């Protein structure tokens, strides 16, 4: 219930100490202002990270090996080792809640680049060995043709999917890309698809258009990798936190 006497008392108290009233009001205003700024910055950071991830599934992680931190059975500390094909199968078999486990390899290691030849033109690009489900983990737009499929995996087909940046640098304007051949470290690959990355990571966005994807099994065979796995892209089921 409205009480005139109470409001008069409040107004008199505020008028009696105008400086304290001003400082208190400023403190309340400043606190609200900072809260709004922090909430806005938090949302902006979240949106920025999502854009920079370039469509990468939010329930996907990457796993790779590092040097050992302890000696083991007479072997020294600091040893380097690799995942192998059986490790991939073990994860699929023994770990519940995984939707995709995609082994990956890259020529030259992390951020490695290798000469790719098309006729008289040469370029340095990242070349990846992948499984078909990788396009579900890091989506990309297929502009022409197709992505890698399990027929390619089973038959070790020498096929590749290339980015728009590769076409701009190695092909003449208007030249037919699908069905052409491109040479990677001396091995000929048939171009079966053209992709466009949806990455928004600044300068990396341009580099993400300059990649080649080939079947994982073909990669291991063509480049003498044996059963080595560089790293894995692992996607959990929707109801499983990672």
Regions found by a protein language model. Name each.
Residues 1-32:
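N-terminal Sec/SRP start-transfer signal
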Residues 93-100:
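Short secondary-structure junctions
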Residues 59, 123, 228-232:
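Short amphipathic alpha-helical segments
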Residues 128, 132-152, 156-242:
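Mid-to-C-terminal secondary-structure elements
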Residues 33-69:
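Alpha-helical transmembrane segments
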Residues 25-27, 40, 186:
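Residue-level recognition of transmembrane alpha-helices
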Residues 66-83, 89, 102-133, 147-160, ...:
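Short acidic/polar micro-motifs at solvent-exposed secondary-structure junctions
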Residues 6-10, 48-49, 87-90, 166, ...:
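Hydrophobic alpha-helical segments typical of transmembrane helices
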């Amino acid at each position: 219930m409205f009480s005139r006497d109470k409001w008069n008392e409040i107004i008199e108290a505020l008028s009696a100490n105008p400086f304290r009233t001003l400082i208190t009001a400023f403190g309340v205003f400043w606190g609200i202002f900072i809260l709004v700024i922090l909430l806005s910055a938090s949302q902006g950071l979240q949106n920025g990270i999502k854009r920079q991830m370039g469509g990468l599934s939010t329930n996907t992680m990457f796993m790779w090996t590092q040097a050992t931190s302890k000696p083991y059975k007479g072997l020294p500390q600091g040893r380097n080792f690799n995942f192998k094909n059986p490790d991939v199968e073990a994860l699929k078999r023994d770990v519940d809640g995984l939707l995709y486990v995609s082994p990956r390899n890259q020529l030259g290691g992390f951020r490695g680049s290798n000469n790719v030849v098309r006729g008289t033109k040469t370029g340095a690009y990242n070349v990846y060995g992948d499984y078909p489900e990788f396009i579900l983990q890091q989506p990309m737009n297929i502009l022409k043709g197709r992505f890698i499929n399990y027929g390619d995996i089973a038959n070790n087909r020498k096929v590749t999917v290339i980015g728009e940046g590769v076409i701009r640098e190695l092909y003449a304007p208007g030249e037919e890309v699908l069905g052409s051949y491109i040479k990677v470290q001396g091995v000929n690959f048939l171009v079966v698809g053209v992709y466009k990355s949806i990455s928004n990571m600044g300068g990396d966005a341009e580099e993400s258009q300059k990649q080649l994807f080939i079947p994982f099994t073909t990669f291991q065979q063509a480049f003498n990798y044996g059963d080595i796995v560089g790293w894995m892209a692992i996607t959990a089921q929707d109801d499983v936190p990672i």
